[in-house]
């Protein structure tokens, strides 16, 4: 077994003890989360090609400071899919509201990575009183704006065709490297691939509909402190695009040095640091 394969095998072994799964019944729906620590809540929403487990290393770094909760988005992991065939961000935000209610979380620092940024922003827009601070990591803009309708149709068709043609395993093999910088090591690649290989086709299809049918800029929250960060080597949500989104959100922006799109996997220590600062800012009202 290679070093990378050993690494990928070791991290899942850490999950039961360090970031265990918990299943909650939300009405007729089951929702899966991973949870560690206690204190002020920070809630982590993953992107389209990932899952709750991808936050393991960040959770290990934050669990001594906060209650860390990462969901498997609807249709991911052991979370029930949404009822809508073509859900929008507000549908995912509705599930998140039910989850936070079930967990007795009144307020939290809310973190959205990539496509998870749409859900995070939509929730903050609708429930600003429940979000201490909104953190967007390499946020996906979405293709739902009228000016991007043609591009959105093309992206949707290609992603659905790729899924039908090669399946989840094929996508994990072909796309994992795209989520990392050219300098990423084999261990990071193995962990990205492990997470992507566990996608559920139905949940992935619904996430494609969200990506191609909704737009982040339609969900600008009011009165919620926000910050935006992006990997300096992110080739998917490029730094210049994330900087423009930060300007639209009137939010501070920074680069995560040496990280590609999967910043929490490639540079977990830097992501942990910026989220620790966001937690501190939520308590003091200022970023240090």
Say what each PLM segment does.
Residues 147-152, 164-221:
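Conserved alpha/beta-hydrolase catalytic His-Asp/Glu region
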Residues 112, 116, 120:
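Gly/Ala-rich beta-loop-alpha elbow adjacent to hydrolase catalytic centers
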């Amino acid at each position: 077994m290679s070093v990378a394969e050993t690494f990928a095998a070791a991290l899942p072994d850490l999950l039961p003890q360090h970031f265990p799964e918990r299943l909650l019944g939300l009405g007729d729906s089951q929702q899966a989360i991973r949870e560690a620590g206690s204190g002020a809540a920070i809630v982590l929403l993953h992107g389209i090609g990932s899952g709750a487990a991808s936050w393991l290393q960040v959770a290990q770094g934050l669990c001594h400071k906060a209650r860390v909760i990462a969901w498997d988005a609807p249709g991911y992991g052991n979370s029930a899919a949404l009822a809508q065939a073509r859900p929008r961000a507000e549908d995912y935000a509705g599930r998140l509201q039910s989850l936070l209610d079930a967990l007795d979380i009144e307020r939290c620092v809310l973190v959205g990575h990539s496509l998870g940024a749409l859900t995070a922003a939509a929730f903050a827009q609708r429930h600003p009183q429940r979000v201490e601070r909104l953190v967007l990591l390499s946020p996906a803009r979405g293709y739902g704006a009228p000016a991007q309708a043609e591009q959105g149709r093309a992206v949707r068709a290609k992603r659905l065709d790729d899924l039908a043609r090669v399946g989840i395993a094929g996508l994990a093999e072909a796309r994992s490297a795209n989520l990392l910088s050219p300098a990423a090591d084999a261990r990071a690649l193995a962990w990205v691939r492990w997470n992507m290989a566990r996608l559920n086709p139905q949940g992935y299809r619904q996430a494609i509909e969200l990506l191609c049918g909704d737009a982040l800029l339609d969900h600008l929250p009011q009165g919620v402190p926000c910050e935006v960060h992006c990997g300096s080597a992110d080739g998917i949500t490029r730094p210049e695009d994330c900087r423009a989104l930060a300007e639209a959100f009137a939010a501070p922006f920074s680069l995560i040095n040496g990280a590609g799109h999967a910043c929490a996997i490639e540079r977990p220590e830097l992501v942990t640091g910026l989220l620790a600062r966001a937690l501190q800012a939520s308590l003091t009202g200022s970023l240090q």
